[in-house]
A protein has these predicted regions:
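Mixed-charge, low-complexity intrinsically disordered regions
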Residues: 1-167, 171-322
Length: 323
């Protein structure tokens, strides 16, 4: 099962202050949504989401595909439009249909939606697992932090962004002399779900803060609630609205008769390995359209004459040299 690895994302100096450019969050947002559906995250409506878990996992785990999809989604949201279909020799270009018109409406709307959310952010924080999942699920209602620097600027009504994916409203901020005192004053299950004793709770915070700093600055209990609008919900709607055909368009795949809806190309390494291998005779008609501008047509010949293959350095096109 695919999982969202927060450790793979550089941890920003916490808390960051001010609005966040949404373009800097697309990768984390896309990775989070794909990993949630690939792993069937509890609470997600997998019935309403049109992409299969295996499809999401393949996008997530193929570095080249993921990077291409991230860059294309970012560009589309900034420009408010989808690129045209890739040109395929011998296949006439299709006229714009209702699906394409729907994409044209979806992208500028959702791009503006994301921008509004990220512009409204006042403080950006990062949390490790399992605390991020607990905050998203609403079981962790209080975030404990050292009362230093910009943390002291957080007040009731502030909008916080966690891990570039989750927005939380600040309901209240209370200051304590120590984490032990905070865990006594707050309901421990709201601060550290799954931890039953104050002693164990203090041990959790000791992994992040020394006792000396705790005594010097004191600590803050930041009570939070989850607003309805969330960046990950918007990204979820973008992927659902594009579906297999729209995402295929972003990845440079041409839609032809007989195209498998959830088909994705193999990794470049697997493709080159196959092309460089021995070609068996009596091969039927197969058309494979791939990203990275690779299109291979195997002709319906019962006996292929001997040939060699090579890779064009600039275009990445596979060349067939007949002997």
């Amino acid at each position: 099962m695919a999982t969202y690895d927060h450790a793979a994302t550089p941890i920003p100096q916490s808390p960051g202050v001010g609005g966040v450019p949404f373009s800097s969050c697309i990768g984390d947002l896309l990775r989070f949504v794909l990993s949630s559906h690939a792993a069937a995250y509890p609470g997600d409506d997998t019935v309403a989401f049109p992409l299969s878990p295996s499809y999401c996992a393949r996008l997530l785990n193929d570095g080249e595909l993921f990077e291409k999809l991230e860059a294309c989604i970012q560009q589309c949201l900034e420009e408010g439009r989808l690129p045209g279909p890739p040109a395929v020799v011998g296949i006439p270009a299709e006229e714009e249909g209702p699906e394409e018109r729907g994409w044209k409406l979806l992208l500028p709307e959702k791009g503006a939606e994301l921008k509004r959310m990220y512009d409204a952010v006042e403080f950006e924080l990062h949390v490790q697992e399992p605390y991020f999942t607990q905050l998203r699920a609403g079981v962790k209602k209080v975030e404990g932090r050292l009362a230093t620097g910009n943390y002291n600027r957080i007040t009731q009504g502030s909008l916080l962004l966690f891990n570039k994916c989750l927005l939380l409203n600040v309901e209240a901020v209370r200051k304590y002399n120590s984490f032990s005192e905070m865990l006594q004053g707050e309901k421990i299950s709201n601060v550290l779900p799954g931890i039953s004793s104050i002693v164990e709770g203090v041990k959790v915070y000791r992994k992040f803060y020394t006792e000396e700093k705790e005594n010097s600055y004191g600590v803050l209990a930041i009570s939070v609630s989850m607003p309805t609008s969330q960046p990950y919900i918007t990204m979820n709607n973008i992927l659902a609205g594009l579906g297999y055909d729209g995402l295929g368009r972003l990845l440079g795949m041409a839609k032809t008769t007989g195209t498998v809806p959830d088909g994705l190309p193999p990794p470049r390494s697997a493709l080159l390995s196959s092309c460089m291998g021995l070609v068996q005779p009596n091969v039927g008609l197969t058309l494979m359209t791939l990203p990275i501008h690779l299109s291979i047509l195997f002709l319906n010949l019962r006996e292929l004459p001997p040939f060699e293959t090579s890779l064009a350095p600039k275009t990445g096109t596979v060349l067939f040299n007949w002997r």
